[in-house]
């Protein structure tokens, strides 16, 4: 029995399912989840001392690679001054100033401790600002596990939402309306019917929780136009895309400015951090300035601020994101060539340093239906073959992959060699 198998068996005694986040349990791909004990650069090492090229990157934060020495040094220095104060620090202001200088939509920002807190708070703020109750989200987009957002579409285009998790009251879920991603006509129809009741539209500008689906041409621009027309707050959930698709996030890359934005992952440099922010006239409705309450014991934690500030400064250097995107493009081109040579139906998607892999014969992946039509069983086999070859991909056919600036030529060649063997075995 491997060390991971032993640890997983032990973990299940007192941790539900043996994990603290469901995707880690390998339910989508089968087998025993790997337990890691070390990470450095582009690699993670499991409890059995096997090393893997890592394309999960702690689900996105590790854009510099693991254990970057400058980030570790910043955290060590802060450790000497304490772990948490529960009071304002100069670093919080530095972080707010830096984020507002980088991200087009940000005029004010509030720090929180997770992406879920950020999206939950942004929605409450939008409701408080507009005085409306309903929100619109999109199929396949995940915005954290707050009650408003664990909702799926009803049976018709204009029906109320229904809970997608036990424990979410139907009376609460009815205020969440779910529409197809990349379908601006559906949004236009919905707002024509109930626009006066809608507080906000929340969207991942690149849908990173149905693998990686970029916006169709005109989709984000259409959302901006319709929100302006109906007095609806437009929220970009940039927890994944922020500081990764471009330094200024997807909103900078695609040239569409939302009213509010949410961030997580990279902004903490690997520590638990999130934030939300946007237009001053909206943000001034947050307590203590306004009537919308939001608070957090560990918000702006000094260790997290130290890691996040160092990370954001390092990725701000000229050419950083071009290098990241170039590696990702070369990776995907190499995978596509090897899949084609093996006769395996395969298509990839990319947004800067994030990517999607689909076992599909489609020309492109644009909608939730396109995603669901891909072969998850083939991905499952591919995942385990790549794992055997020393490459760690996201353990789900519906999760995005991430590259880091630590990935280089050696990692690229190792990955492509493993993929060539894997595709050959899938024939």
Curated annotation (Swiss-Prot):
InterPro entries registered for this protein in UniProt: 4pyrrol_synth_GluAld_NH2Trfase, Aminotrans_3, Aminotrans_3_PPA_site, PyrdxlP-dep_Trfase, PyrdxlP-dep_Trfase_major, PyrdxlP-dep_Trfase_small
Organism encoding this protein: Pseudomonas fluorescens (strain ATCC BAA-477 / NRRL B-23932 / Pf-5)
Cellular localization per UniProt: Cytoplasm
Modified positions (N6-(pyridoxal phosphate)lysine) in chain numbering: 265
Recorded name of the encoding gene: hemL
Name assigned to this protein: Glutamate-1-semialdehyde 2,1-aminomutase
Pathway given in the UniProt record: Porphyrin-containing compound metabolism; protoporphyrin-IX biosynthesis; 5-aminolevulinate from L-glutamyl-tRNA(Glu): step 2/2
Family: Belongs to the class-III pyridoxal-phosphate-dependent aminotransferase family. HemL subfamily.
Co-factor(s): pyridoxal 5'-phosphate
The EC number(s) this enzyme carries: 5.4.3.8
Self-association state and partner proteins as the record states: Homodimer.
GO molecular function: glutamate-1-semialdehyde 2,1-aminomutase activity; pyridoxal phosphate binding; transaminase activity
Class of this enzyme: isomerase
